[in-house]
Amino acid sequence: MQRTIIDYYLDEEGDWVALLSCQHGQHVRHQPPFVNRPWVITQAGRDAMLGSGLNCVRCDRLELPDHLVLLQHLECRDGDMPPELRAGLATQAGVWTRILVQEGQLICHLGEPLANRLIATPLAELMIPPEVLYSIESDPPPSFILEYYGPQRPS
């Protein structure tokens, strides 16, 4: 899945890492002849690449970035599911959705670029990357927890 470069930082070994709009970090090394990224060497080169896309395999694998914090926690029980979950919604850049089914079963439809149908049963966890349209269907209504994770907000 293509994600936008929003920033850079150095890892513990001094290698550049691109921070993507999904909040995953991806190394952007210049190691010819294997990896040819001369732009990473200079500040001007890195700045020129801000806003460009990189493929994020961790989003493809639905992996929540480790450094995110819980932003919101909602418990949905006995059919009180927010209507926008049935109609379809997508979170903003950097905000992940976690669904934990407690009772019943739900089906989650993920839009492009993932285009997948996930079935969740009790104690199953679904992770939905930022900016991916998703909708939920179920009959009968399940009980589940809906959580949103994102970067730590300044205090």
Please place each PLM-identified region on the residue numbering.
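Short beta-strand-initiation
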Residues: E13-D15, G94-W96, T121, E131
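Glycine-centered tight beta-turn/hairpin loop motif at sheet-sheet or coil-to-beta transitions
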Residues: S21-Q23, P113, P141
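Motif-centric detector for short Cys/His coordination patterns
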Residues: M1-M81, L85-G88, L106-H109, A120, ...
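Short acidic-glycine-tyrosine-enriched beta hairpin
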Residues: P113-E131
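Short, conserved beta-strand element in jelly-roll/cupin
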Residues: A93-C108
